[in-house]
Structure formats: C-alpha cells, structure tokens
C-alpha cells in the first residue's frame, strides 16, 4: 500500500469516528422534563439551543415562551402541561 493510499485510509477512518461520536453525543438527553409552556405565540424566536448538549450544567433545551432555550428542568410535568410537547424539536 502506497503512502497516499494509507493517508486516504487514515483520514477516512478519522472522519467516520468523528461522525459516529458526534451522533452518540447528540442522542444524550438530560434528566428532568421541560416546564409546561402555555404561551401562544404568533412568531417563534430564533433558537438559543438545538439539543440538551448545547446547554450548560443541568439545563435542558426546551421550547418555552416562543422559542427553544436552555432552562432548568422540572422533576415532573406540571399540571396542565403536555408530556408530548418535547416532540416538536427541530
């Protein structure tokens, strides 16, 4: 195997590894649930986060008050909330 073939193989392996690790990292969801959000919005704000991993510490990426933001989660869903609200993530 020539040195150029070896280099192409090593670069390909490195890229596959990086993509695989990034995919695993994004799938991790932090503990707790998003607070109930009963605010009606005419227009959504730009997202401040996309996944829980974008948020520092224990904060989760939740749709709250017209946009995705990093917020402190609640242990249980508050009365009047909808546990399925979390499925609207982009």
Curated annotation (Swiss-Prot):
The keyword Signal applies. Its main location: secreted. Disulfide bonds join 34-62, 41-66, 49-61, 55-70. SMART domains: WAP. Residues 27-74 form the WAP domain. Residues 1-23 form the signal peptide. It is found in: Secreted. Keywords: Antibiotic, Antimicrobial, Disulfide bond, Protease inhibitor, Secreted, Serine protease inhibitor, Signal. InterPro entries: Elafin-like_sf (IPR036645), WAP_dom (IPR008197), WAP_four-disulfide_core (IPR050514). GO terms for biological process: antibacterial humoral response; innate immune response. One of its GO terms (molecular function) is serine-type endopeptidase inhibitor activity. GO terms for cellular component: extracellular space. Antibacterial protein. Putative acid-stable proteinase inhibitor. This is WAP four-disulfide core domain protein 12. The lineage of its organism: Eukaryota, Metazoa, Chordata, Craniata, Vertebrata.
